[in-house]
């Protein structure tokens, strides 16, 4: 599968950002991505993460016959594999030009620089020597493979332990880790590669380019150096012409970066060795326990927020006031009106109206009480007319009369009827007077 090319818009955007000294991940020109080193349960196994670029390093050893021209030296072998798991553009089982170039650069950086004492790998001169094999697997590709691979290779070699051997006459005895402690390799120094990407024919420079920056770069300069500022190898690719001052400046930057990376490697090795001695938990499972599959991880980028408030005030002062926007337009036509439009708010007058109603209610109660205070004779007359209400001097009957709401009205109606209609005795007396006359 071929690599997806960048569009013209993306290319122009990246180049313009580089001209303005800006990078997509928020780094500065000479900033490296975060480096994370984790070790496996076995010696010589590690994973190095350079940003999102991941490389797995594994070191193994075996006893073999030495080379004819170097009978007293061991053998170092490096192998870098680019699988489709890292990027779809990599083809499995095929030696691409990129893979060949990376393997050669690793051999020059680690084997030709004599960072490992190969004579200490000899067991019997001319017969048995140790062959150290370093296998590097690219797990994820996000640019700058050579830097991540060189760090993974040197970390795996420093972490590796070979079995102990003893020679008695012609007999060679190989001891297991349970019988004797494994022996570490003799390492003189740690060469580390630092990559520099050039743009616009060497006008602009970036350290540790990522995958998108590598697509638009014009040339690449790789400098392998140790913490003693000794250059192990240097390689330029891309066909650009570099000035002597540019190479010197890159070498100074590489010296600073290599010193920082070497210190990080030594701290990681010391921490792993201390955990193993104390009997604590170690391995890949412990190193990635916090990064669960279902969890999201967000990398924070530093942002300068010193002048944000001042700029915000300036923008607000310069901005024009927004026009008034009617959320719901109303169309006024003849014969239409809106309830509550133009009327004063009367919510505060509710208390006064409630007080007035209470006062009126008190007046009605006094009137009802006055009406109930009637003569006993009149009440007896009402009862003689067939009314069901009978009053007496007892307090219980008076309370029964006052409790219902309609009883006072009935009393009023009956009293008014008695006043208008004369009694039967009065009617008989009037008839007698008329007959006498």
Swiss-Prot record:
One Gene Ontology cellular component term attached to this UniProt record is:
nuclear chromosome
SUPFAM superfamilies associated with the record = Ribonuclease PH domain 2-like, Ribosomal protein S5 domain 2-like
Residue ranges, compositional bias (Basic residues): 426-437
Its GO biological process annotations read: exonucleolytic trimming to generate mature 3'-end of 5.8S rRNA from tricistronic rRNA transcript (SSU-rRNA, 5.8S rRNA, LSU-rRNA); mRNA catabolic process; nuclear mRNA surveillance; nuclear polyadenylation-dependent rRNA catabolic process; nuclear-transcribed mRNA catabolic process; positive regulation of cell growth; positive regulation of transcription by RNA polymerase II; RNA catabolic process
Q: Name one Pfam family in it.
A: RNase_PH_C
The region called Disordered is annotated at 339-437
What is the location of the Glycyl lysine isopeptide (Lys-Gly) (interchain with G-Cter in SUMO1) cross-link? 297
Q: Which domain of life is it from?
A: Eukaryota
Q: What keywords tag this UniProt record?
A: Acetylation, Cytoplasm, Exosome, Isopeptide bond, Nucleus, Phosphoprotein, RNA-binding, rRNA processing, Ubl conjugation
Cited InterPro entries:
ExoRNase_PH_dom1, ExoRNase_PH_dom2, ExoRNase_PH_dom2_sf, Exosome_comp_Rrp42_subfam, PNPase/RNase_PH_dom_sf, Ribosomal_Su5_D2-typ_SF, Rrp45
Q: Which residues carry this modification: Phosphoserine?
A: 65, 306, 346, 392, 394, 407
According to the UniProt entry, which residue ranges have a biased composition of type Acidic residues?
Answer: 349-363
N6-acetyllysine carried by residues = 297
Q: Where is the composition biased (Polar residues)?
A: 413-425
* UniProt main location, coarse: cytoplasm
Which is an annotated GO molecular function term of this record? mRNA 3'-UTR AU-rich region binding
Q: What is the annotated localization of this protein?
A: Cytoplasm; Nucleus, Nucleolus; Nucleus; Nucleus, Nucleoplasm
Q: Which family does it belong to?
A: Belongs to the RNase PH family.
What does the function comment of this entry state? Answer: Non-catalytic component of the RNA exosome complex which has 3'->5' exoribonuclease activity and participates in a multitude of cellular RNA processing and degradation events. In the nucleus, the RNA exosome complex is involved in proper maturation of stable RNA species such as rRNA, snRNA and snoRNA, in the elimination of RNA processing by-products and non-coding 'pervasive' transcripts, such as antisense RNA species and promoter-upstream transcripts (PROMPTs), and of mRNAs with processing defects, thereby limiting or excluding their export to the cytoplasm.
Query: Assembly and interactions?
Result: Component of the RNA exosome core complex (Exo-9), composed of EXOSC1, EXOSC2, EXOSC3, EXOSC4, EXOSC5, EXOSC6, EXOSC7, EXOSC8 and EXOSC9; within the complex interacts with EXOSC3, EXOSC4, EXOSC5 and DIS3. The catalytically inactive RNA exosome core complex (Exo-9) associates with the catalytic subunit EXOSC10/RRP6. Exo-9 may associate with DIS3 to form the nucleolar exosome complex, or DIS3L to form the cytoplasmic exosome complex.
Q: What is this protein called?
A: Exosome complex component RRP45
Q: Which organism is it from?
A: Rattus norvegicus
């Amino acid at each position: 599968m071929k690599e997806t090319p960048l569009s013209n818009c993306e290319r122009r955007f990246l180049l313009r950002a580089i001209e303005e000294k800006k990078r997509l991940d928020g780094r500065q020109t000479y900033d490296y991505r975060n480096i994370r080193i984790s070790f496996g349960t076995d010696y010589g196994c590690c994973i190095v993460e350079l940003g999102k670029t991941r490389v797995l390093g594994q070191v193994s050893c075996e006893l073999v016959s030495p080379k004819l021209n170097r009978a007293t030296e061991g053998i170092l072998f490096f192998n870098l594999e680019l699988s489709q798991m890292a990027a779809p553009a990599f083809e499995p089982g095929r030696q691409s030009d990129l893979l060949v170039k990376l393997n050669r650069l690793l051999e020059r950086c680690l084997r030709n620089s004599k960072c490992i004492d190969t004579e200490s790998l000899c067991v019997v001169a001319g017969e048995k020597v140790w062959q150290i094999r370093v296998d590097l697997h690219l797990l994820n590709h996000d640019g700058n493979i050579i830097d991540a691979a060189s760090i993974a290779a040197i970390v795996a070699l420093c972490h590796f332990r070979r079995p102990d051997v003893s020679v008695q006459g012609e007999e060679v005895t190989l001891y297991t880790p349970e019988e004797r402690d494994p022996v570490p390799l003799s390492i003189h120094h740690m060469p580390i590669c630092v990559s520099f990407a050039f743009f616009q024919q060497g006008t602009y420079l970036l350290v540790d380019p990522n995958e998108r920056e590598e697509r638009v770069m014009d040339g690449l300069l790789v400098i392998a150096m140790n913490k003693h500022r000794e250059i192990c190898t240097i390689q330029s690719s891309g066909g650009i012409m570099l000035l002597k001052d540019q190479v010197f400046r890159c070498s100074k930057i590489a010296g600073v970066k290599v010193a920082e990376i070497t210190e990080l490697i030594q701290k990681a090795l010391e921490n792993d060795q201390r955990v193993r001695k104390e009997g604590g938990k170690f391995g890949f499972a412990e190193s990635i326990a916090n990064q669960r599959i279902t969890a999201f991880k967000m990398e924070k980028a530093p942002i300068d927020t010193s002048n944000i408030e001042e700029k915000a005030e300036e923008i607000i002062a310069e901005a024009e006031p927004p026009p008034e926007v009617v959320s719901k337009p109303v169309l006024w036509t003849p014969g239409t009106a809106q309830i509550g439009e133009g009327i004063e708010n009367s919510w505060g007058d509710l208390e006064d109206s409630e007080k007035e109603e209470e006062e009126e209610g008190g007046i009605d109660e006094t009137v009802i009480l006055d009406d109930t205070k009637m003569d006993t004779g009149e009440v007896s007359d009402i009862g003689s007319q067939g009314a069901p209400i009978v009053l007496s001097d007892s307090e219980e009957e008076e309370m029964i009369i006052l409790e219902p709401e309609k009883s006072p009205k009935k009393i009023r109606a009956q009293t008014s009827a008695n006043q208008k209609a004369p009694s039967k005795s009065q009617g008989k007396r009037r008839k007698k007077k008329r007959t006498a006359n």
